[in-house]
Amino acid sequence: MAKLTKRMRVIREKVDATKEYGITEAVALLKELATAKFVESVDVAVNLGIDARKSDQNVRGATVLPNGTGRTVRVAVFTQGANAEAATAAGADLVGMEDLAEQVKRGELNFDVVIASPDAMRVVGQLGQILGPRGLMPNPKVGTVTPNVAEAVKNAKAGQVRYRNDKNGIIHSTIGKVDFTEAQLKENLESLLVALKKAKPSTSKGQFIKKVSLSTTMGAGMAVDQASLDTKAA
């Protein structure tokens, strides 16, 4: 059996894998156990009551977290004309059409989000094999193919997270950093869960959000008691 590291031993002693923690206790534990030499992200895994094998039950979308993610996001925009000027004014890091596509083909992928206006998809479509596997391909379902590229840029910069269930019906996302306050992390988590509830497929029956777990980049996961959260959709 592999020898446990000191960090893993501490986590095993502190975290009860059979317990659901109230959000206050969960965040306090996450902060206590986040001892890496960098500011760790706080990640969430949400088990949904869906059959991921059925396309009409898959959940996909995007939402802007009220307190952002703590990450600096570089945004590339495929567009032209007035939209290009608007994207630049909104804070886009890279704006272009064929010239930007050539950069991508050369492997220059120094961006985290790709946005495109509908008229630019003829150019972006040629980059599917490069952008697709990296989760960067623009898609209207998550608001990254849109005539309003300026708004999309602002959302991306403000802390928008995109979500999509995996083959096990689990959504993985980030809700901030360990140096966020408890209130900021709680508000971000509640905002994400409200967005997921609104995205519930009509064919999904029974309990939709079955389990919510929080973890840090280098830490163990812990289940969160949903009763400690306010996830009533406005």
Swiss-Prot record:
Q: What is this protein called?
A: Large ribosomal subunit protein uL1
What PROSITE patterns does this protein's entry cite? RIBOSOMAL_L1
Oligomer and partners: Part of the 50S ribosomal subunit.
Cite the source lineage. Bacteria, Pseudomonadati, Pseudomonadota, Gammaproteobacteria, Aeromonadales
Q: What does this protein do?
A: Binds directly to 23S rRNA. The L1 stalk is quite mobile in the ribosome, and is involved in E site tRNA release.
The regions listed as transmembrane in this protein's record are: none
Organism field: Tolumonas auensis (strain DSM 9187 / NBRC 110442 / TA 4)
Q: Name one GO molecular function term.
A: rRNA binding
Does the record bear Ribonucleoprotein in its keywords?
Answer: yes
Pfam families, A to Z: Ribosomal_L1 (PF00687)
